[in-house]
Amino acid sequence: MSEKHPGPLVVEGKLTDAERMKHESNYLRGTIAEDLNDGLTGGFKGDNFLLIRFHGMYQQDDRDIRAERAEQKLEPRHAMLLRCRLPGGVITTKQWQAIDKFAGENTIYGSIRLTNRQTFQFHGILKKNVKPVHQMLHSVGLDALATANDMNRNVLCTSNPYESQLHAEAYEWAKKISEHLLPRTRAYAEIWLDQEKVATTDEEPILGQTYLPRKFKTTVVIPPQNDIDLHANDMNFVAIAENGKLVGFNLLVGGGLSIEHGNKKTYARTASEFGYLPLEHTLAVAEAVVTTQRDWGNRTDRKNAKTKYTLERVGVETFKAEVERRAGIKFEPIRPYEFTGRGDRIGWVKGIDDNWHLTLFIENGRILDYPARPLKTGLLEIAKIHKGDFRITANQNLIIAGVPESEKAKIEKIAKESGLMNAVTPQRENSMACVSFPTCPLAMAEAERFLPSFIDNIDNLMAKHGVSDEHIVMRVTGCPNGCGRAMLAEVGLVGKAPGRYNLHLGGNRIGTRIPRMYKENITEPEILASLDELIGRWAKEREAGEGFGDFTVRAGIIRPVLDPARDLWD
């Protein structure tokens, strides 16, 4: 992309305060243990407010009641979000029963939130329940280590229920990569699990004493599905199979979607192809990419610290050569692969192992007992009788995996009675939002609470123009950090202010093109008016099989983003 102007390998200058905090934290301990015993505040103070993120938690408050509490001279109602580490999204039914119980008894909101990074979150954990949640997870073989902040986050893996053998192999690699890149500090075990301090000094051979410059995201993807949205991630291993068996990976590095409104130095970027590697080099290459970013990433500006910016600064070829040097390998040429879609196949799918897999559409990933739709109770009942496992997808849905023919009817009956199999439109199945209000401190506009009624309106437009059986990949994210992955959608809404969004168009169905801003800071009626006209044109003028995003580019409605580091903001 930008080989012409390679910049310095290391950015000199004053380090950010986050770097000071990590350096002084004694390998992520800080004074979290002491802070836990401070009953005067419901939150964590000073550096601990940020340090708990390395332990998988974010401190939040209920923004719906923030002003009211301020008037009463009360501190915000602090509560933690906890995100579990769950490589590939696979969770046993025993683990599910434990998290269901904790959510119901020990969180403010009582829900389990499936995320588009293939794990679950608890929202609304009061300080007194913070230690118990880590102990509960540990008791069933789970943890929340390194699911937030400057680490390698939860490793994603394509949810492919059909090719069971290939999925099993890819999933094992997702787990191995996750384990290999975990921090080695004993802080987590000491603080949450009461394990004794050992005299040995901590060492972080891969992550280093100050960890990574910024968050780092990794995927294992099995074509032709791009359900995990590889271009949103720093490091991607694309599975290459021969005769149904995994033989190696294509490596793509440097994707990422987060931007800042109006800051043209920030941009979303698709990942760059580095080459093919045989399986035996996987962990060495993963480590080499991470340590190169550790050493070369910008620690003087967190808005310029992600791998995508490092690649653009030093040049893709320079970064790739350093990865080869550190891993002691030479990449082979990229092997052919293609993507055909990224949605989940809702309903029953029979695997080549003759087991059945039931993918349930969970709107916004929010599992709760709703009036007439007791989703949470239904899943608990299934977990009690199901012999296989559950798999969370990167589309915030849930797969009941490995159901023998003899158990199918029993599980389907519970699912139907609980509202887990209610029919929804293809459009709703292909729409997604991040959490946003009321819990996310960064939210600028509604997302999860906005999406259901917004999609009602879109469904009406699709029906009006005779395309109800079609879909447009549509996503809403409450702020430009982009958790809702709107910057890889055909239609992406990025929150700007309460009730206002930037409308992006021109991504594609398979998630390989960044959409461009079409209109700025507009309201829902204005968004719907624009889409009414454009969906009408698409319905009439499209070519056979042409998706909405591709149509908007071909028809000249929007210019495609070809080189986002240079042309995203044009």
Curated annotation (Swiss-Prot):
A Gene Ontology term for the protein's cellular component: sulfite reductase complex (NADPH)
Annotated positions binding siroheme: 483
Gene3D superfamilies attached to this UniProt entry: Sulfite Reductase Hemoprotein, domain 1 (3.30.413.10)
EC number: 1.8.1.2
InterPro entries, sorted: CysI, NiRdtase/SiRdtase_haem-b_fer, Nit/Sulf_reduc_fer-like_dom_sf, NO2/SO3_Rdtase_4Fe4S_dom, NO2/SO3_Rdtase_4Fe4S_prot, NO2/SO3_Rdtase_4Fe4S_sf, NO2/SO3_Rdtase_FeS/sirohaem_BS
Pathway: Sulfur metabolism; hydrogen sulfide biosynthesis; hydrogen sulfide from sulfite (NADPH route): step 1/1
Cofactor comment: Binds 1 siroheme per subunit.
Recorded catalytic activity of this chain's protein: hydrogen sulfide + 3 NADP(+) + 3 H2O = sulfite + 3 NADPH + 4 H(+)
Keywords: 4Fe-4S, Amino-acid biosynthesis, Cysteine biosynthesis, Heme, Iron, Iron-sulfur, Metal-binding, NADP, Oxidoreductase
GO biological process, one term: hydrogen sulfide biosynthetic process
NCBIfam families in the record: CysI, PRK13504.1
HAMAP family in the cross-refs: CysI (MF_01540)
Primary role: Component of the sulfite reductase complex that catalyzes the 6-electron reduction of sulfite to sulfide. This is one of several activities required for the biosynthesis of L-cysteine from sulfate.
Protein name: Sulfite reductase [NADPH] hemoprotein beta-component
Biological source species: Escherichia coli (strain K12)
Gene name tied to this protein: cysI
